[in-house]
Amino acid sequence: TSTPSVMTESARLGAGLLNDVRGFRRPGALQAAAATALPLCVMHMQGEPDTMQQNPQYDDVMSGVRHFFDDRLTACEAAGIARERVIFDPGFGFGKTAEHNFHLLAHLRDLCLGGHPILVGLSRKSMIASVLDRAPEERVFASVALALMAVERGASIVRVHDVAATADALAMWGALPRSIDR
């Protein structure tokens, strides 16, 4: 949510995380978040939800996202939010072209700075359709593949639609180093 009163009420009702697609930029959002003990997922988005996909442009998408993360971390700390509470989300599909999204994924490790967890939401995204031309419900296998790529490149948290398939794939991926070491 991006609405401070909803953040406060969500925390009161037992939410485990505050996730704001606007990166806690609305007036009062950081103050409301600071008043909770919850972790914050700060997401990058160019523009606003209703216009974000209208010709998104960057000189350098990695620098743009990294600068946004630095700026928001400074703002979080100024609001009294401990660094350890901050999770970053590069905002796949939020004000980015498919090319931007694939570039971010390929270089995701470069966003893993300062020990902050990176959360990614790649499941069923339109970037998959840019390659496979499939409807969202037909993007399960590609979504699982993207989740694996993201974790391999440093993502700590993956937000998915197909939990069992993704969990199984990550379990197999995680078992590989153990079997090699034996």
What are the language-model segments listed below?
Residues 4, 11-12, 16-75, 95-182:
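Active-site-adjacent loop and "lid" segments of alpha/beta metabolic enzymes
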Residues 78:
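Conserved phosphate-donor
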Residues 82-85:
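Short acidic capping loops at alpha-helix termini that bridge into adjacent secondary structure
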Residues 92:
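Active-site metal-binding loops of divalent metal-dependent hydrolases
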